[in-house]
Amino acid sequence: MVKIEAIAVDVDGTITDGKRRVCHSALDALRKVEDAGIPVIIATGNISHFTYAVATLVGTTGGMICENGGVIYHDGYNDNRVIVLGDISKAQRAYDFLLEKFGEDIPFKIVEDSDARVSEICFYKNMDSDPLKELLEDFDVEVYDSGFALHLTDPEVDKGTGLVELAKLLDYNIENIMCIGDSENDIDFLRAGGFKVAVANACDELKEIADYVCEKKYGDGVAEAIDKFVFNE
């Protein structure tokens, strides 16, 4: 068991429940971690504005990974501006193809916050990701299913590369970071970390690579892992 010096945690489906409500158990556990001097990193497919609000609400100090690794941020670095790692033009070319193919009948609806996204394009999840992946197989773009949305991203970035870059920026030892997630877009993220945790509601692919699969779902699973591996309770 590695010594945990930081915790990186996903948001939707990990510290929130199936209705995207923040679990009090996760809030309490993450604040307990911060009070113990262990920084918490928020890692999500959401935009930086949303992520910053979550980080402020929880009280985390470890930095942020946003837009599935396309953006990273930490107060006091880069003149307090986000660092953009992903190339949104790749997603834009794929989206232009979809618009040309389907016109007004396009079956994929862009989420309202897309104008604020700087590294990817995001659709509401009104269908499985496989048809979209097939449509865009000839494009230099990755299709991620976050459980709540479908994301078109630069294949050169993911939550894992975002974690690596943030760790370099803040001088974290990535081998001592516990990563907690639930969905497909957390696979690379967990692989990058030192100790991998999947909450009970996680997809099978994530459970297969996890060092520990929680008995509890959502935020209760986050609290379970923190109590067990950080505080030995």
Go through each PLM region and give its residues.
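Hydrophobic packing residues within well-ordered alpha-helices of enzyme cores
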Residues: 26, 51-55, 132, 206, ...
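Short acidic-hydrophobic, aromatic-tinged amphipathic segments that line or gate anion-handling sites
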Residues: 213-216
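Non-catalytic pre-domain segments flanking phosphatase-related domains
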Residues: 1-9, 169-172, 176
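Conserved acidic, metal-coordinating active-site core of Asp-based
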Residues: 95-193, 197, 201, 207-209
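Residue-level signal for inorganic ion chemistry
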Residues: 44, 68, 190, 211, ...
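Generic C-terminal helix-cap and adjacent flexible tail
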Residues: 228-233
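Active-site phosphate-binding/coordination module
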Residues: 18-112
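Asp-based phosphoryl-transfer active-site loop
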Residues: 3-20, 190
